[in-house]
A protein has these predicted regions:
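Surface-exposed binding/hinge segments that line
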Residues: 45, 55, 89-131, 152
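Ligand-site clamp/hinge motif
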Residues: 136, 166-211, 338
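Long beta-strand-rich cores associated with HINT superfamily self-processing modules
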Residues: 441-471
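N-terminal lobe/hinge region of extracytoplasmic solute-binding protein
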Residues: 1-48, 78, 143-145
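Structural transition elements
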Residues: 269-302, 316-322
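Extracytoplasmic/peripheral linker and loop segments enriched in polar/acidic and small residues
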Residues: 338-348, 375-445, 471
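Gly/Pro-rich hinge or "lid" segments in bacterial periplasmic/extracellular proteins
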Residues: 31-35, 115, 122-173, 177-179
Length: 471
């Protein structure tokens, strides 16, 4: 989007996630094998899951020549967590009561309650460590510690990089130069990789996978993970403030049809919550929600609603989002619910439509842990709660359980808690989650990658520039 910014607190699409991962690093990272490991932190420790100590790597330099110290970490986190912050990561850090430097290479973070999964949180792509001066960071700076130095950035257009000769990671960042181009048009993206104008594309339209697979110079790279496509209803906006209406819409969707016609089988059914089978505490025991016209009509009549309901859609959300919205409208029509699909422009979609209009199409990369996913988009104090589900009795109960689960070390008890949170979201929340999608890329065979490719984000967890190389 032309509103994109180098302020990592505003990152909201794969173009910016990849840009940040290319010029910056985080305290922790998710490896290509899906495992959590230290990045700018060399090690971490906690005796009670409430006080966390991160020991920093020594000798790491920012692109401006400044040596990384604990002050940079403190200033970065303070930027994202201060009361006036508009950072999407602010909700992730509300549990942090204090963060302080203990010498130049040690950071101590105090939480208001134990959270065994906190090291995952500090790997969030928004929490990119930037250099500080007088206790502050320049949020608009493109200076980081990553494998590539940002050369040029045109919002919504392109970003170019040169290899960082002083990169601290061994065996990483193999390209001399990297250029990322924002191609929102699916056909343009496909043509670019087929013609050799680009070496790789992400978010391949499932409809073109078979075509691209026949191109002898290309490899189709497909990874199942936590990526899911959603249609968030803002529960504080009419008519979605009515639970019966929300349930009517949830029961009006032919999910298998969406998986078959939109994903062409490159994914699986969703059950109106964001936790996938790749997550440790997926609630497999919840009944799969199906197209149920009788139940949908019962709820619709109980809602008292009549007239047209608008669903804003754009393929900026995901390939085939407009078609998916049309299928939802068609199945709802069988029930007797009138849905008008509003085609929204791709440019500015994330700024003007998502998290603003009452009902729209969306995608979420998902997160490796339940708490991280909830902290990003479902708890009551995150900016990215795109359903605004915060104050219903079930939402209050959900938030309470999430806080309890963070401190619960008994695995069976945590599982029970997280299963209950998934039920609460599915039955009361505003998220329609009809399907989980595989990450699909088309990559030139002149580009090589490791045996493992991360599924936490597209493009090898956003770190393709660091992890891939010329074949």
């Amino acid at each position: 989007s032309t509103t994109d910014s180098l302020d990592s607190g505003t990152f909201e699409n794969s173009m910016m996630t990849n840009t940040g991962m290319t010029f910056g690093n985080h305290l922790m990272e998710i490896g290509s094998d899906g495992q959590l490991r230290p990045e700018l932190a060399e090690s971490y420790e906690s005796s009670d899951a409430k006080t966390w100590i991160f020991n920093l790597r020594q000798g790491v330099e920012f692109h401006n020549g400044k040596t990384l110290t604990s002050e940079d970490v403190v200033a970065t986190f303070d930027y994202h967590r201060n009361e006036d912050s508009k950072s999407a990561a602010r909700g992730l850090l509300t549990a942090v009561t204090s963060i302080k430097a203990d010498g130049p290479n040690r950071v101590i973070m105090e939480l208001n309650a134990p959270n065994a999964g906190f090291p995952y949180i500090v790997s969030d792509y928004h929490l990119l460590i930037k250099p500080s001066m007088d206790g502050k960071i320049d949020s608009q700076s493109g200076i980081g510690t990553g494998g590539y130095v940002l050369q040029d950035f045109e919002p919504g257009v392109r970003a170019t990089f040169k290899r960082n000769a002083n990169y601290w990671k061994e065996g990483a960042a193999h390209f001399d130069e990297v250029e990322m181009i924002s191609l929102l048009d699916t056909a343009a993206r496909q043509s670019a990789v087929m013609n050799g104008d680009v070496d790789a594309i992400d978010r391949v339209d499932p409809k073109t996978v078979a075509l691209l697979a026949r191109v002898p110079t290309l490899e189709i790279l497909e990874i199942a993970g936590t990526l899911h496509y959603t249609m968030p209803m803002r529960v504080t906006s009419e008519p979605f403030d009515n639970l019966d209406l929300r349930l009517a819409l949830k029961h009006s969707i032919k999910r298998q049809e969406l998986v078959d016609k939109i994903l062409l089988g490159h994914g699986s059914l969703g059950n109106d919550h964001p936790i996938s089978t790749a997550n440790p505490f997926h609630a497999s025991g919840l009944p799969q929600r199906e197209f149920n016209p009788e139940l949908a009509m019962k709820h619709y009549k109980a809602s008292g609603h009549s007239g047209t309901i608008q669903l804003s859609a754009s393929d900026a959300a995901f390939a085939g989002a407009v078609d998916a919205a049309q299928l939802v409208a068609a199945s709802a029509k069988e029930v007797g619910i009138d849905i008008e699909v509003v085609r929204e422009p791709s440019d500015g979609y994330w700024s003007n439509v998502w998290n603003k209009k009452g009902w729209c199409t969306c995608y979420w990369g998902g997160r490796p842990t339940e708490d991280w996913m909830y902290s990003s988009a479902y708890v009551d104090d995150t900016e990215w709660n795109d359903t605004d589900w915060r104050s219903t009795p079930d939402a209050v109960k959900f938030n309470s359980i999430v806080k309890e689960a963070r401190a619960e070390l008994d695995v069976d008890k945590r599982r029970s808690m997280y299963e209950e949170t998934q039920r609460l979201i599915a039955d009361d929340g505003g998220a329609i989650v009809p399907m989980f999608a595989n990450h699909i890329h088309a990559v030139s065979k002149t580009i090589a990658h490791g045996d493992n490719v991360a599924g936490n984000w597209s493009s090898d967890g956003g770190k393709f520039a660091e992890r891939w190389w010329k074949a």
